[in-house]
Amino acid sequence: VLRNTLAPGTELMAVVKAEAYGHGGAVTARTLQRAGVRAFAVACLAEGIALRKAGIRGTILILGYTSPEEAPLLTRWHLTQTVADIDHGRALAARGRRVHVHLALDTGMHRLGILAENRKEILEAFRLPNLVVDGVFSHLYVSDSLEAEDVAYTQEQLTLFYDTVAWLRTAGYDPGKVHIQSSYGLWNLPAQPCDYV
């Protein structure tokens, strides 16, 4: 059902954190992988490793914080780490291990990421040695609501996010996989130009 609503070129990234919300992380991920899903998101390093041990291929994005001391495990298990803020990015880079990351951009939730308006820190994150930025993302935290105030706020988040992505491209940086929508956003705001939903 979700696939039928995706814009051309958009893939599903299945969020299977917390044992797929109680349904069994590995079982759910294997079923989705057989159905063609090639990207997954988890809450923490242990969940990512568990999926790899269960035979899950493709991208596995860790949405939560991973201690920089555990960077070798990110590399060993071919996991992609969210950069929680610029200090986290600096600390990961300082470990001297090549780590694939997605950069979280804070477009208003104020829980995770570099402020989308802070272009100096965003550029620094892209320039950090040992970090391979494979994507940028944010979270539309009221996209499940159709209240006028929430719709307006979601639109502000989208504008800020896509303006930042466009600025990165103009500055000569490839943002990689771009993702901001959840399934709620997909229903309420179809056809956004995303690589993942």
Model region roles, listed by residue range:
Residues 187-197:
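Active-site loop ensemble at the mouth of alpha/beta enzyme cores that anchors a bound cofactor
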